[in-house]
Amino acid sequence: MLKGFNELVQIDGLPFCDKRKAKDDNGKPIEVPYLPWAKCKMLLHENGASEVYFLPLKNETGGYLFQSKEVHDKNDRTTGCYFVSVEIHIDDKTFRMDMPLMNGSLVVYDDTLNQLRISNAHARAFVKGVAIHTGLGFKLWLNDKDTE
């Protein structure tokens, strides 16, 4: 049986993270830690979960992107303010997590959409959904500036 939230939230996820290159608010290159989905899955099993998987959800036309609003920037580039959704299964628990389709902290425009970005967004949705619902990796988001 999977350990409870209060136990899992105490696991330091940082040593299990990989790093990706990004830029800070001033454009300075930085490295940002992220927990790979496969490592997240293994940690769940190591902490008592028997069955762990996620399913990318499809929209009404069979695609993996959900659109919330079409927006044009000053150069007339278009984005649908896209997001993805996954259904996460951990033993007898099932929950859904939505995640915006982003390129780091940048908007993904229609002319830069690709399958890798969509797949990465599904993986991020899984990891963040696990953190919210189980506590595993939750501390990785404690300093996130979600309201900016």
What are these regions (language model features)?
Residues 1-148:
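Polyanion-binding surfaces on beta-sheet-dominated domains and ring/shell assemblies
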